[in-house]
Amino acid sequence: MPVPPPPPPPPPPPPPPPPPLGAPPPPPLGAPPPPPPPGPPVSTDTPSLRKPDLKGRSALLADIQQGTRLRKVTQINDRSAPQIEGSKGTSKEGGAAGSNARGGNTPPALGDLFAGGFPVLRPAGQRDVSGGKSGQGPGSRAPSPRLPIKAISGPLPAPASPRLGNASETHSSARPVPPRPSVPAPPPPTPPPPPPPPLPPASPIKAQLVSPPAPPTKVNPSVVPPPLPCAPPLPPPPPTPPPLPPASALSDKAVRPQLAPLHLPPIPPPLPLLPPCGYPGLHSEPNSPAQEVREPPAPPPPPPPPPPPPLPTYASCSSRTAVAPPPLPGANNSGSETPPPLPPKSPSFQTQKALPTPPGAPGPQAILQKKRRGPGTSGGKLNPPPAPPARSPTTELSSKSQQPGGQLRNGGQHAIDDFESKFTFHSMEDFPPPDEYKPCQKIYPSKVPRSRTPGSWLQAEAAGQSSDDIKSRNSQLSLKALPVR
């Protein structure tokens, strides 16, 4: 209270602003009522009325100043402290708990925000903290709240563990856990690439084909580096020759090579690129046996087909890195039956060949195309190669079926050529020659009414011309004007 008395002296200066109410304020300062002769009584009354006002103002100023002092004391932070202190009590109280608690407990607020900002979660978290001291772990580290959501194993060991030391260990152990899920995560992407399941329709043996796809999905999680894909396909060919040449062995052979490459490629981890590279070769093999089984010369061709597939697969890998169509013709010449090597180049040809040869196969293989295009780059990179089919017309059916699809997949030029080839156009000679141009005076009916009055037609009729004559003349004029246009 000793402080308020000094402020009253300053209040007199503030009163001057209110003087607009009347000149009385100066009279109090200069007590003489004589200066204002007209209203001396008023001046005497005003000071008596204004004195309480001054006192009230001084009280208001004192209150305001006190408020400012209270703000300087920063009681607001103290008010916020008790809330954090409550959480401190639940967690841990150290010698320097004041600053440390504030600094360490601010993250829990972030944790609450991450948790969703629901007030209900806070007491639940505090209860867990009271049960086990691991609560400080999330407090000290904001990311920890996220970890419990991903892997609950982290927070569970923490309660048994002591304070931050073990909590940090648990968090470190919990952090590697997320990468592990990321490692198994690749299997979901791998299932789309495995196109072997659709293969069964091409080859009679379905059970054996169904069994191989399962192992690749299991082994594929480790699949990562793409560079090795080209090398692994080469080893699989040796296992292919051992099978016997007979047609019955052919189907088994087609199945066995598939099993071998499926198990081998996953080891040299070629996840995205190899499955498209290797699988087309596999597709070519089942297609070739199907064709060969139907054709009479089945026994002789079996040995040659195994060697060509590795070449086309390697060529396909190289073509994806740098497009090189020539290897395909070489493979075509080397193989006794050219159609099988072509499919590895692009999956689109497989379906086109499957349509003429095996009737049941087109549906599943069409699904294969969608799956392959879905995984991504393989479909886009295979677009340019489709040109070769026209170069190597192995069979009329295959070449005809491949040309339209391949050209449509090529650039716009091929599409334009196909579009024009669908229609027959007449030459300039087929059309009748235009009428010869003869200069003549032209009369435009639109200009006639402008030059003459609206009653010109009536005048013309009066002159002896009937409306029919006028109409015939106009029609003739319009006919003459048409050729000029």
UniProtKB/Swiss-Prot annotation:
Expression by tissue:
Isoform 1 is expressed in brain and testis and isoform 2 is expressed only in brain (at protein level).
* Record PTM Asymmetric dimethylarginine, positions in chain: 57
Q: What does this protein do?
A: May be a regulator of cytoskeletal organization (Potential). May have a role in spermatogenesis.
Know the name of this protein?
WAS/WASL-interacting protein family member 3
What are the UniProt keywords, alphabetically? Actin-binding, Cytoplasm, Developmental protein, Differentiation, Methylation, Phosphoprotein, Spermatogenesis
Q: Which gene encodes it?
A: Wipf3
A cellular-component GO term for this protein: synapse
Q: What information about domains appears in the record's comments?
A: The WH2 domain is found in a number of putative actin-binding proteins.
Q: Which domain of life is it from?
A: Eukaryota
What SMART domains does the record tag this protein with?
WH2
The WH2 domain covers 56-73
- Complexes and interactors: Interacts with WASL, and monomeric and filamentous actin.
Region named Disordered: 1-485
Q: Name one GO molecular function term.
A: actin binding
- For this chain the motif WASP-binding motif maps to 424-448
* Short motif (RLRK): ranges: 69-72
Q: Record keywords: Signal included?
A: no
